[in-house]
Amino acid sequence: MGVPPAGVVVAATKPHRRSICSPKNRFCSMALVTERVRYIGRKLKKVFRCESRVTQEKSSISDGERINSSNMKKRSSLHALRAVALTLPGLAQATDGDPSTFTFQYGRYEEGKRELFDTKNDEFDPIVVDSIFGNVSLNFLDRFKFSGNYTQDTWSGATPITTAPLQFMFDTPTGASSFAATNVFVDADFDPVDTSVFTPSGLLKDTQLVHMVTSASVETRKQGDFGLTYEWDEAAATVGGGLSSESDYESHFVNIGGSLDFNSKLTTVDFGMSYTWSDIDVNLDPRFDPYIDEGNHGDDVEISIVDGNRVTSVTGKRRDWSANLGLTQVLNKNALIESSIGYTRSSGFLENAYKVVGFLFVEPMPGMPFLSGNFDGVLEQRPDVRNQWVWDNRLVHYVEPLDASVHADYRLYHDDWGITAHTLELDWNQPLGRGWTVIPRVRYYSQNEADFYQPFFLFKQAKPLLTPGRPDIDFSQVPISEYSSDHRLSGFGTLSGGITIAKQIGDAVSLKAGFEYYTHQGGLKLGGGGEDDFADFDYWAANASLTVDLSAKFLPVLSSSSNDHFGLHRHRGHSGGHAPAGVMFSHMLPSAGDFMVGYRYMRSERHGDILHGTGSVSDATIISQGCGNVQCSFAPRQMIMNMHMLDIMYAPTDWLNLVLMPQFVDMEMDLRPLPGQSLDVGEHQHGGNSTHETGGVGDTGLYALIKLFETPGHHLHMALGGTAPTGDVAQTSIREEHPPLGAAGTVEEFVHYGMQNGSGTWDFRPSLTYTGQGGAFSWGGQLSGIIRLDHRNDSGFAFGDEFKSTLWTSYNLFSWLSASVRMVYTRQGEIRGEYDGPHSEIGPMDFPESYGGEYWDLGLGLSSMIPFSGFEGNRLAFEWIQPLNDDVNGFQLEREGSLIASWSISY
């Protein structure tokens, strides 16, 4: 499958490949079809195979990026063909039967530096996106399938907002003041000119263009969606929906679809429809707002005063209707072909509110060698309706002598904005034996520019003024009504190459890792005539994923029956029953060769009063005492932290377990201004946006669990290991300054200490765990600690050491369900050192002494061993942590509580 034009958002349900084979079908072993559903530019994919069908959905981290994945198992040439055919890009393996699966994927997208010609724009880091994706696909009641997905993208870095002649940039940090220039100079051909000592006139033509870029604080997008499918013998129907939310854009979507099989299931027809409704609410960058004319957007623009500052907001609504029709045909035992057409109609606010267009007004004066004009910035204006058509084609062919398959894709895209795009892609899927598969690929993409795109717009007329003596443009006198300088609507081509490596581990677990490198160039446009080379850049994308077949044969699980002495059989490593969800390293795998995969989620919240010691304090106390020698101007209103962690455990012996625990975090802090404080020069201004966000890869845990003692009903083991500093501790935010004279400015500085993604230090995290069980009761205790092995991290500080102790007991309510109660004591030291770079000191959260303390908590939990057929061996556990007492260092926001959920399965 190809990719749409960069910057083109296609909200469409796009089915592709589905085929279900009858037992009498001689091509059954290789027939295959996939449905692909695209929600707002993110790809959700489904795979079906002959004896059974499995759905696996995936979200790409960005338009134009896709990491292929595959899993194959060689049995015979026909079985190999089937497996090879199933290795479609981005999709998990379909296994025998009708399996339920769990998938977790991490992806990273990173752009290279752009050519900014030594302007101060070059100081900005390029775009980086960290993405996580989770999917659970469950089969139930024989013919039903449920698929749920969660996607999270965290963005940071600088992106172009417009294009301007280099000579208009004035070497400013963002280029914004280019639009404040009352006079710019062009020659008789209306080309920009530069000063020169080598020409008699002192001016020299210079047509070089350059991107204006701007950087923003970290932002996170979260999306959840679901699908429910019912299957008949020769048909299927699906309904689904979801929500995508970020700080300035929220979308809801629903879809319906179906498929019909004909010709002994050698032919499949797919069809579907979707509807998306979106709300846009953007606060314009205060660095650009004073220079940008928003008058062309009328009622979409609202100006308000927040915290004493002017805030310009752009709001709008968008609607997308989509329909599609697809056909899959099995040609012979070695090949199948797929083709589909899709249509999307988008209406409403289709602009990107962050994109600016340069208007150059020059009044012609015949006979003059040089002319002066005005260069003004306006918000882009796109058509209110967009009609889009897509035609996708794919050929899958099994190459029997090499036990491999080739996938060839072509996509044609066209819309009524004047963009036509072509995508060619070629994948080679090669099994290597022992569960290994390698998939190299190459992709070429080309599009022409939109009808209303130009790097900037030249008008051979005097600047039309709405009111004499004021700079506002009279847009009724501008000869065009639609215009954009968004480089994603320009003419360009991309060429990419990549590789995916997949490994099947037993019958239940598959691992994949992929990498793809892209080059984006105007010169690669089909037929030439693309954007000039100032817009060229490279980027890369990589991901890694783990997929677990939930219906595979797993280890026997802990029995909770009183008829089983101490509840012990093969899974004896769980002596003492299952600990609450929040207890790490609570058990060991019992036998050499055992393997466990788990997922853990934690959400913790802080809001309410500001505490000092054990009591709450007033705002007046915070102002006078919370920020050292200066007065505080802000205090935290709320902080939310989400953590996603994988638990991967392997037992090389019956007394030693090895554990890998990668984690991914995101945090959000909302601030409130303190009463009576001056928010003028040099203070921290949010311009209406008082929320900071961070997120990405956290620290990675590596541990060894060692069994010390075990008898029936009692078990003791210790954990030795710790975390590697893979989490970023250089997360920054943009501080806006509003001096009384001059334009708004910004400073990029370290975000509040508690919002960094990791510790930045190598941390030793030992623990000692005891568990026991008698009858329906089980109990346990754990001592654990964190010792920072580095005195400072790369940002100049180190979090305090930590000691924790916990005791719990649980009772079996049923043979499959237990309830637990837990007490937790934690002591954490304050931060050592401080940031060694720019950082705010506007509130208590910015001072190292306001971290750490002593905490008492109560945990209430439920743990279940799933009793349903097809899900045996799966454990689900939940625990709520309720704070009982806080004795904090410095001034800290009150803790509200934490929710912990975990899932695990062993085989």
Q: Which residues does each PLM region occupy?
A:
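Transmembrane beta-strands of outer-membrane beta-barrel pores
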Residues: Y106-G112, Q152-S156, W232-E234, G241-S247, ...
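Outer membrane beta-barrel transmembrane domains
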Residues: D194, F198-L204, S340, T344-Y398, ...
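Outer-membrane beta-barrel translocator/channel fold
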Residues: E115, T151-H211, S215-G224, T268-N334, ...
